[in-house]
Amino acid sequence: MQEALLKCVHEVLSATAGTKAEGVYFIGMTVKGSVVHRKIDVVVDADSGVRIDQCAFLSRRLRERLEEDEEMIGILGDNFDLVVGSPGLGEPIILDRQYGRHVGRLLRVSYSDLEGVEHELTGHLLEVSLAEGAGSIMLKPRVEKKKGKGEELENITLELGAVLRAVPEAEI
């Protein structure tokens, strides 16, 4: 079922050239429930962030595609919920290309060093390099302010291969 659904999602996304959803790409999908009532959540993004009208457009197109396919109706049943949305705040970055739209924002990053020891830091994403096979990110670590003047920390560059998890954070 997952493969057939993924195929439909990718068909709809590949047919968006020249539409309001052009540039939107697939992040992930979850399917819950039984044939009596299924819920399909499709997560998409765009390099400049996905808008609600793009999600609505893709939701309509995907629903039409699923409902016209007898095989999919047999798999999903007649009663299914379909939600197309963007990754919310606090959701981890899944694809390398998502880093670009978070430049200047605060990220919480878990990474492993050369010895395999896991570390975590929070900082502003300054730069992203998506070179083939050797991408990296540069972060300015956030200093917790205490009485007096806090120490200034050096920028840190991490290879994307060392990043275990990166999550955009809200700044207050």
Curated annotation (Swiss-Prot):
Q: Which InterPro entries match?
A: Ribosome_maturation_RimP, RimP_N, RimP_N_sf
Please give the organism.
Chlorobium phaeovibrioides (strain DSM 265 / 1930)
Name the family the entry cites: Belongs to the RimP family.
Please give the HAMAP family that the UniProt record associates with this protein: RimP
**One GO term of the biological process aspect:** ribosomal small subunit biogenesis
| GO cellular component labels | cytoplasm
List where in the cell it is found. Cytoplasm
What job does the chain carry out?
A: Required for maturation of 30S ribosomal subunits.
State the coiled-coil residue ranges: none
Q: Which UniProt keywords apply?
A: Cytoplasm, Ribosome biogenesis
- Tell me the SUPFAM superfamilies matching this sequence: YhbC-like, N-terminal domain
Q: Which gene encodes it?
A: rimP
Predominant location: cytoplasm
Protein's name in the database: Ribosome maturation factor RimP
- Lineage, highest ranks first: Bacteria, Pseudomonadati, Chlorobiota, Chlorobiia, Chlorobiales
